[in-house]
């Protein structure tokens, strides 16, 4: 394999690692979306679904770049979905996951730079910025739950109820 092919393979490997992480996030967040909705936390469920959709976009962006480089996008999921989480545990867990993702993506961005692929490095920078927004949201909700507890969660249930038929 030539140096160029080796560098490209390194970048594709980095992209597939990130794609696998995004696939896990999609499954985890959609599972949480369904559970939050079932527990009548509609506003939290709706926001979780929007974040999962962001992760779907990221996953597709990584896949498109992998294909542009001549690689095969992975369909492997990085981890197992944690099911049946208590509402109070979801947001601190997701915050930790997003923090880990940001750290790993920064490392993968460096792999791209070290292998001369600035375009893919910029893709990672863009996605890292969006992951930071998710982290901030999860931290904010986690802090509200920790500080206000059931009062906060009750308010969410009351604010987001289905309209009654008239």
Give names to the regions the model predicted.
Residues 25-28, 32, 36-76, 137-144:
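Conserved alpha-helical segments that form or flank metal/cofactor-binding pockets of metalloenzymes
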Residues 45-49, 92, 121-126:
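Short, charged, amphipathic alpha-helical segments
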Residues 4, 40-41, 74-84, 106-129, ...:
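Acidic interhelical loop/turn segments
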Residues 4-14, 76-97:
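Acidic/His metal-coordination segments adjacent to aromatic residues that form catalytic metal sites
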Residues 160-166:
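Conserved small/polar residues in nucleotide/adenosyl-binding loops
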Residues 61, 96-104:
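Amphipathic, heptad-repeat alpha-helices with coiled-coil/zipper character that mediate oligomerization
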Residues 14-18, 23-30, 102-106:
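A structural feature that tracks compact, well-ordered secondary-structure segments
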